[in-house]
């Protein structure tokens, strides 16, 4: 019987960027047994030491688009599909093993009114005029024809650079993410901001929440899981 799993990762670009010698652990799951969690992380530590690493950090993935962090509160809240879920005992195991929190990831829930408050509209107009910005919607044809797929990920690389543990995505990774994610996004929920020269300076992407649909599907596409997902994506007023 499988009682735990973990991945050991050395992100050399991140280590070079942040001048670290760290081995990452990610995709960690274990039963509520201190011996199991210790055995998993002992293996990661040993593997990292063999390769010259001096510290262990996690949960982290290969890039910032992989799942990161560990849930420590809000267990009673319905999270987004991309949020890590783990049982409360996970963080207790980490603390017993000597791990300390190094960064916070915080998820917010905002209630969007049917009509935007006039104050928001007024401030938005002032900012657009002051910095000479233009807001546009992305068209499917522009992803390739005007290279907006590449521009969006170049912007993410630049904007995310100061974030904890970030390492810039390679061109190969960018190509894969463009192929994987952009066809799934409802472009009506994507907004772009460009400066006076037409250069992309900001992007905002919203997606319908699939959490309730995944619960109804019980995590499976068949026999009828696909129906709940399609309904959430295209036929139901979205919760974003």
Which residues make up each language-model segment?
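Short, mixed-charge, low-aromatic patches
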Residues: 2-3, 46-53, 102-111, 130-135, ...
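Feature marks short, surface-exposed loop/turn motifs that line or immediately flank catalytic pockets
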Residues: 12, 62-66, 114, 210-212
């Amino acid at each position: 019987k499988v009682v735990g799993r973990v991945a050991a990762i050395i992100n050399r670009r991140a280590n070079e960027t942040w001048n670290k010698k760290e081995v990452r652990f990610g995709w960690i799951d274990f039963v509520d047994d201190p011996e199991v969690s210790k055995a998993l992380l002992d293996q990661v530590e040993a593997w990292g030491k063999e390769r010259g690493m001096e510290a262990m950090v996690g949960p982290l993935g290969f890039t910032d688009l992989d799942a990161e962090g560990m849930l420590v509160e809000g267990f009673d809240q319905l999270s987004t599909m991309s949020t890590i879920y783990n049982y409360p005992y996970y963080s207790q195991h980490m603390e017993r093993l000597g791990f300390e929190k190094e960064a916070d990831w915080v998820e917010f829930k905002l209630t969007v009114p049917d009509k935007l408050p006039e104050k928001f509209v007024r401030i938005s107009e002032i900012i657009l005029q002051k910095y000479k910005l233009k807001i546009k919607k992305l068209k499917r044809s522009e992803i390739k024809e005007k290279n907006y797929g590449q521009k969006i990920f170049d912007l993410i690389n630049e904007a995310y650079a100061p974030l904890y543990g970030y390492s810039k995505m390679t061109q190969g990774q960018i190509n894969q993410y463009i192929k994987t994610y952009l066809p799934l996004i409802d472009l009506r929920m994507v907004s772009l901001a460009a400066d006076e020269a037409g250069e992309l300076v900001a992007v905002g992407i919203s997606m319908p929440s699939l959490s309730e649909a995944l619960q109804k599907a019980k995590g499976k596409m068949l026999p009828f899981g696909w129906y709940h997902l399609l309904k959430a994506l295209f036929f139901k007023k979205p919760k974003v």
